[in-house]
């Protein structure tokens, strides 16, 4: 007769399994037994009743313990709790009009999964504000704040919707190298790394590899990945590592195909975000305006004249500085009520060598930026697809074709006309939710001074 199998001892931290997140509880579940998992947000004790507020990633749940009807051992556990304890609560759902979502939980079991010190580096409830340096020194605890949870919940949904839109439009997701042998844009704003016996760089952009995938026959590609810029900025709008949402598409007529796809995608995505997160946006005091199509196009030379009329004088064929983008936004907003506009026809001298020049005026390009609420969030263009012109433009910038042979050579073999763009996801999130600092839109910022956490 075979010996009986030993029954493993119960692990107290595994007794209760989550049945619902906080936002899944509703008055229609009256009397239903559920389990929630999360952290103690706060405890409020009155003479005859106590309230335990539990926070999970989806929000808050009020747990109500009437002293006369609650087991003494449960009240004893309640007395042992403190803010940020990790706990599991089992209980019955009860309708309560004054509670969040019209529902509360009457616990019959509380399990302490882990404790936290009485003195915390931050107040996760947000009642006591901390400066941004303290918050990011303690970023993991800072991420427990409801505002941070909502920010990255909305950002996740936004990226997912953008991915789905491109997938439906026939794009394939790709994953390009982040350790590269040459600079994508030229220049010195590169992070150098030692790659065994060779010198290498962290990728500024997936640009070359996006294009090479199209030359390789992929037709339509996109990538969501980090890029690295060794720019010595220390501003509320710059990061040295950020997430770039890139796409590249072949067989285009011109840059308008790229711009039209982006504006249609953003219109659909913003509509979905606004519909899904009405309550969350209200909590964040954020208002999303869905862009009307088509988004206005303003040629750079026209923009310079508009700015001149407003007292901001720029040299002819110069780039538009950040204060110019903000001023143009105010003009567009006042005139049309819209928050997006494209800047087009950028001068050749200030765009990358692979940007297609305008046939009727080679001093201008088929490059563009998208400005949202006064900040550039996208840069893109039609690219040069003819080998001879690509080499010519590269030489004009002082770069050596031999250094870029791996990129240039495939263009000898029938490269299709193509174009694409890159969207800075942190900037898009920042502007969408109305933050003053881009660091609010990235989990663990990498800027001029910060390497940890």
Features from the language model and the residues they span:
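TRNA-recognition modules of translation machinery and tRNA-sensing kinases, especially anticodon-binding
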Residues: 216, 220-223, 239, 243-254, ...
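A generic secondary-structure signal for well-formed alpha-helical elements
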Residues: 44, 89, 95-97, 114, ...
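His/Asp/Glu-rich mid-to-C-terminal helical/loop segments that flank catalytic regions of hydrolases
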Residues: 245, 251-274
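Class II aminoacyl-tRNA synthetase-like tRNA-binding/catalytic domains
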Residues: 11-250
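Secondary-structure capping and boundary motifs in well-ordered enzyme cores
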Residues: 79, 183, 198-204, 213-216, ...
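Short Lys/Arg-rich cationic patches that frequently serve as NLS/NoLS or arginine-rich RNA/DNA-binding motifs
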Residues: 1-6
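Hydrophobic alpha-helical scaffolding
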Residues: 29, 148, 152, 177, ...
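Metal-assisted phosphate- and nucleotidyl-transfer catalytic regions
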Residues: 184-185, 189, 264-370, 396-409, ...
């Amino acid at each position: 007769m075979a010996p009986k199998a030993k029954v493993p001892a119960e692990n107290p931290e595994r007794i209760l399994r989550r049945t619902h997140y906080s936002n899944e509880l509703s008055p229609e579940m009256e009397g239903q037994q559920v389990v929630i998992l999360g952290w103690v947000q706060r405890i409020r004790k009155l003479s005859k009743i106590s309230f335990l507020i539990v926070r999970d990633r989806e929000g808050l749940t009020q747990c109500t313990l009437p002293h006369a009807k609650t087991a003494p051992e449960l009240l004893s556990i309640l007395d042992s709790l403190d803010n940020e304890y990790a706990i599991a609560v089992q209980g019955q759902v009860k309708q309560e009009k004054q509670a969040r979502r019209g529902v509360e939980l009457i616990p019959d079991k509380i399990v302490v999964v882990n404790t936290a010190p009485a003195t915390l580096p931050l107040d996760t409830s947000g009642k006591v504000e901390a400066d941004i340096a303290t918050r990011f020194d303690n970023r993991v605890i800072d991420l427990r704040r409801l505002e941070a949870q909502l920010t990255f919940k909305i950002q996740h949904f936004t990226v997912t919707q953008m991915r789905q839109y491109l997938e439906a439009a026939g794009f394939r997701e790709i994953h390009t190298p982040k350790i590269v042998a040459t600079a994508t844009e030229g220049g010195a704003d590169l992070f150098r790394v030692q790659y065994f016996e060779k010198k290498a760089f962290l990728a500024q952009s997936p640009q070359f590899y996006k294009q090479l995938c199209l030359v390789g026959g992929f037709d339509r590609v996109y990538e969501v990945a980090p890029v690295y810029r060794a720019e010595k900025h220390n501003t509320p709008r710059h990061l040295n590592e950020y997430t770039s949402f890139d796409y590249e598409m072949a067989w285009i007529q011109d840059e308008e195909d790229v711009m039209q796809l982006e504006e249609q995608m953003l219109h659909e995505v913003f509509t979905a975000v606004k519909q899904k997160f009405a309550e969350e946006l209200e909590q964040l005091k954020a208002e999303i305006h869905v862009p009307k199509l088509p988004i206005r196009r303003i040629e750079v030379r026209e923009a310079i004249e508009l700015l001149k009329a407003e007292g901001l004088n720029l040299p002819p064929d110069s780039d538009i500085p950040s204060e110019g983008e903000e001023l143009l936004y105010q003009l567009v907003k006042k005139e049309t009520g819209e928050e997006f506009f494209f800047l087009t026809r950028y001068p050749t001298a200030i765009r990358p060598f692979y940007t297609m020049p305008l046939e009727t005026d080679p001093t201008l390009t088929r490059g563009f930026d998208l400005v949202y609420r006064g900040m550039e969030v996208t840069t893109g263009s039609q690219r040069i697809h003819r080998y001879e012109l690509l080499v010519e433009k590269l030489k004009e910038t002082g770069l050596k074709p031999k250094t870029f042979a791996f990129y240039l050579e495939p263009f000898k073999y029938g490269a299709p006309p193509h174009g694409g763009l890159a969207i800075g996801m942190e900037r898009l999130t920042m502007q969408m939710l109305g933050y003053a600092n881009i660091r609010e839109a990235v989990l663990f910022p990498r800027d001029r001074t910060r390497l940890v956490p």
